[in-house]
C-alpha cells in the first residue's frame, strides 16, 4: 500500500483521533512536478524499494510495517516493491497520475435499499479510468428523489458547511 502526503499542502494540518497520517492513496497531484513529496509505504516485508516511472528512488528497511521516503514528485507511475529477508520479491503495488478529464463518480455501497433503510453513497472526482483526483474542488449539490437526504459530508478540511446541508462549497 502506498500513501502520499498531499504534495500541494503548504500549511500544517492537525490530525484527529481518527487519522494517524495525512497521507492519501494518490499519485495525482496536478501542477506539482518537481515539488518534494513524502511517501509512506505499508508492507509486511523486510524491505521496500520505491520506483518512480521505472527508476529506483531507493530501498529502505521496513519498521513497524512502514517505510518512509522523501522524493521529488513526478507525474506518471509510482511503484513499491516489497522483499522478504532473502531479497525475494513478495509483492508490488502501483499508483498512477490521473488524466486531464474529470468525472464525478457516484458509488453506492449497496445496489438496493430496503424501505426505511439508509443508502451510503460515495462521491469522488476521478479521471475516465477511475483514478482519484484529490485536488479537484467543485461545488456539489445533492438532490434525492423518493427519499430523504439524512447527511452529506466530506473529509476535506477546507469544506464549508455541515452534515445537514444539501450542498458543499470548496474553498479555493
For the regions a language model picked out, list residue spans one by one.
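Short, acidic Ser/Thr/Gly-rich low-complexity loop/linker segments typical of extracellular
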Residues: 58-62, 157-163
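Short, solvent-exposed loop/turn segments enriched in Ser/Thr/Gly
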Residues: 116-121
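Short, ordered, surface-exposed loop/turn motifs in non-cytosolic proteins
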Residues: 134-140
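Short aromatic-acidic-glycine turn motif
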Residues: 143-158
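Conserved small/polar residues in nucleotide/adenosyl-binding loops
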Residues: 169-172
Amino acid at each position: 500500500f502506498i500513501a502520499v502526503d498531499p504534495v500541494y499542502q503548504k500549511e500544517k494540518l492537525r490530525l484527529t483521533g481518527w487519522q494517524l497520517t495525512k497521507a492519501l492513496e494518490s499519485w495525482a497531484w496536478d501542477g506539482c512536478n518537481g515539488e518534494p513529496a513524502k511517501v509512506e509505504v505499508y508492507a509486511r516485508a523486510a524491505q521496500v524499494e520505491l520506483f518512480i516511472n521505472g527508476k529506483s528512488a531507493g530501498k529502505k528497511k521496513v519498521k513497524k510495517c512502514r517505510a518512509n521516503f522523501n522524493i521529488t514528485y513526478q507525474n506518471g507511475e509510482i511503484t513499491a516493491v516489497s522483499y522478504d529477508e532473502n531479497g525475494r520479491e513478495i509483492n508490488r503495488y502501483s499508483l498512477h497520475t490521473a488524466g486531464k478529464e474529470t468525472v464525478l463518480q457516484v458509488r453506492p455501497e449497496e445496489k438496493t435499499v430496503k424501505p426505511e433503510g439508509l443508502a451510503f453513497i460515495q462521491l469522488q472526482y476521478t479521471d475516465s479510468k477511475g483514478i482519484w483526483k484529490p485536488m479537484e474542488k467543485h461545488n456539489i449539490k445533492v438532490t434525492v428523489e423518493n427519499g430523504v437526504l439524512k447527511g452529506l459530508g466530506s473529509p476535506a478540511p477546507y469544506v464549508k458547511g455541515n452534515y445537514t446541508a444539501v450542498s458543499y462549497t470548496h474553498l479555493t
